[in-house]
């Protein structure tokens, strides 16, 4: 358009000047008369001022008419005025056209500048977008790389976990092979674990409820803690009162027992007289018949008990052993009865004489029965009071423990819920951070686009085309809003789920309270049953069955609780799935945002294309600019929509941040209750960090479930082993070995626990002293209390050491040691737990062992006292005493051997530990430090859990100690009662006729006692599997019942002592004691055999470890030797480098001398023409040769001095090389002179061969030296070889040169050759002598070194 306007404007002035000539003619015709000649000068001026185009036309009219007429002048004037007007118009038009052109050019320049600026801005925006996209891609790549690394790390952790699982599975297979009969129990445990898994999925729904009730639970816990403190104070007061009463009653009982014993001894003295009597045969036969009847009744009872035992056999395999022992005892009782029958046949002849004495004895017996009945009433009242107090205490303790367990369960569920929430919040925060980054990048793009928009505001005309794009953006906004609403609805659903979980927790608390009430009712029923148990044996059996049923009900209640927990776990898993879905939705939102970004990129590409079109077609710029403005307006609208979306997202973020703050406040409150569950929290935190990768989270959950299953299986195995240990009734020696093993394992845990190990060894020594000091039971009890106190202090020290271990994690320098310790900890975890359980059981069995030992000691005293009274059977008793003394000596020797074996075991175990440490150090150096760090953290978490368990066990041990003290008081009371019995038995001398019936009833009572003990032990073993603490309390109650039963039995013995025969009683007691001693000896021998077998196995292990140690020592020696060789090679390399430098210096000096010699040879050849100067030249050459030899000697001496610092072997090799180098130089010099003198081809070739041989020798020595040099210096030696080769080539060239030179002069100097040869022959031996002297000097210096 601009070109067209220009052409139109330029054509207008050209068309206008064409018509003036006709107009001038007309005017000249009309106005010729009126005008005068006066205005001529003006016309000239105007014509002179006119442009040349106008002046050129009138010139042809002027030339022909030089004398103008007035008409012509007038016409000219008119034409001039017209022309001037036309010219003025044309000039004005031209000015206007120029102004328009300038304006158009300015507009064009402005438009072009605007376009350029817009293009620049668009390009800058595109570049920034590209940069943002590249940054996004980098971030995505880095995110993917981090994901890949995390996946790799998780895979490595999973591999390590799988390895652990493989090892644990191997251990489980070994355990299953040993316990094939326990598969049913394991299957039941696995089913329970599956139920627990199912319930764990439900625990996530209960997390918010647990948080809401956390404060209430804490308040309730504080109230219960206060109540527990009050109850504990009351219990202490009651225990003090009971202790005082028990001590008093024990003193009285001891006095009564001593009296009864004295009376029994007197009766035994009288039984010898009664044995002569035969009158009591008939009564004894009746008693024998009664015994038979009683035996049949006992057999019926045995059948009943066997049926009950068969029912319990399916649950516990170890009870069969106890039944076998009971059967053995019964068989022994039957044997004793047979012996008694034989003795009764012998006593038939004697009993006739004892009839007269029976009447007086009956009167005495009646008096004693009255006294015994009075004592029984007193004892029954006392037992009732004690039982009532203990039952109240047990009730209170059960309440406290149940409350504590409930609180712990609630705390665990809270912690799990909080951890899951933390994981969810962390994922949300990551997504929000990504969104914030995208929003920041979008804002940057917006700022840049706004800059471009400010420049392009003048082009906002086409807004209609952007309406479609704005509608699409609005649709996307609506989609985002819907997604946000969905998120909010999900949050609301989570809140509702939390409310539901809170309600469930409230229901659980109510159930727990109902269970507490039911437990109270059960305790009341137990009291009633205890009162009814005194009626007879049938009531006792019914009571036991009721207890068993109640224990089953408790088991069922515990299983119901487990099922509830499984449901809670299922709910938690469902929550996890919901969170995964939320994360998937968030990822989809991110994908939508990425699509929008791509859409922006496409729109920017379209803008670029349109800007290129604007450049190509300037005429269509308005349309293109309209399109651009339309696109920019659409972008603005889209940006506004994006800003709105970002604002909405920021609001959502703020709401999420508020929720996070609320959650953090709740977590801070809950973290105060997490002190006891640090290990579980760490594991859950690891799971929360792993939530970034959903697939890995599932695998980790599976691994955790597997570990929980393994742990529960291990717990079942541990419980079974505890039952086996309780049935086996391990002796004190086994307890001592267990303590030693615990000490050794604690040494393996850390070398810093030496003080703890020493104190545990002191405990082991104290436990050994229990075996040596069986007679001094009171001292043993005191020492046991001290040892337990020390154990508590040691456990505290273990906690301190565990804290120090946690601080040692920060020390990176000790990573290898940490890895070694982690493996040691892995291998010893299982044994540590086993031995802790064994200690708990062993501490429970110590009281029983002590009571047995007291009974044995008392029986020994009775035997020694009976030895004085027995006159007829003194020989038999003396033999028995001698056998007992021998057995006692054997026992002492066995005990000493046991101590020696234990000491040896400790020494062997120490050696094994040292060897195992060496082996582990050498093997663990190849492992990775990262895996060891992870394993170390896991092991430390487990250590914390185990230390907590140890603390609980220490508390249980303290309770056991207190209860053992109470039992000790009861034992003292029993001893007092026995003393009273002895006094009462002195009065029973007249009751010899009733001895047979008394013996029968005693046997029956013993059988009943054995059966009672068996049933009680069975009950205790079954209750131990349910709850250890409740089992301990019940065992104490059973022991109290046993004591009461023993008191009742003593009373029965006292009542029936009038009907017993003293001699039969002595024989049965002796037999029983002998059988017990034999059993003890057999147990000791078995223990010795086991110790010997262990010693043999330990010796084998020591031998294997010694072989390993020798192999490792050999490897270490080889390693040291290799290191020494490396050091020697390094020193050799250094020396070789030094000597190479020296040789290089020698080479340079020799080359310089060779050049000098060659110059001198040339000068000498030139001077051969002068015969007068021939002698002088030879003398000069000889002197120079001597100078050269002296120089070589000096160099050899200096080299020898420097070689004194190196090894002899290197000195010889290097000196040989150094010695050869000057000799070779001398030989080369001589050969060159010979070549110059002789000038014969075959001699020259021979000399070259000699040179080559010398060079080969030097090369061989150099190769030998190179073989000794380390590979690091081979490159330097190769360079030296190249230099030697170059030297050889230069020497050959010089020889050729000298040969050529000598051949040219052969014709001229043939007469002087003979003289030259003679002089050279004189020189050669001198030079050889100098070389030999140098060799001798070098060898002498080396020999002196």
UniProtKB/Swiss-Prot annotation:
Localization terms from the record? Plastid, Chloroplast
Chain intervals with Basic and acidic residues compositional bias:
59-74, 319-328, 1200-1218, 1265-1276
Source organism, top-level taxon: Eukaryota
Is Phosphoprotein tagged as a keyword?
yes
> Modified residue Phosphoserine is at which positions?
1279
What is the transit peptide's residue range? 1-79
Keywords of the record: Chloroplast, Coiled coil, Phosphoprotein, Plastid, Transit peptide
Question: Looking at the record, which segments are called Disordered?
Answer: 1-76, 319-339, 1194-1221, 1265-1345
- Coiled coil segments of this chain: 78-147, 252-1162
Where in the sequence does UniProt note compositional bias of the Polar residues kind?
Answer: 1291-1304
Show the ranges annotated as biased composition (Low complexity). Answer: 24-38, 329-339
**A GO CC annotation given for this chain:** microtubule associated complex
Q: From the record, give the cysteines joined by S-S bonds.
A: none
Assigned protein family: Belongs to the WEB family.
Protein name, entry field: Putative WEB family protein At1g65010, chloroplastic
Give the species.
Answer: Arabidopsis thaliana
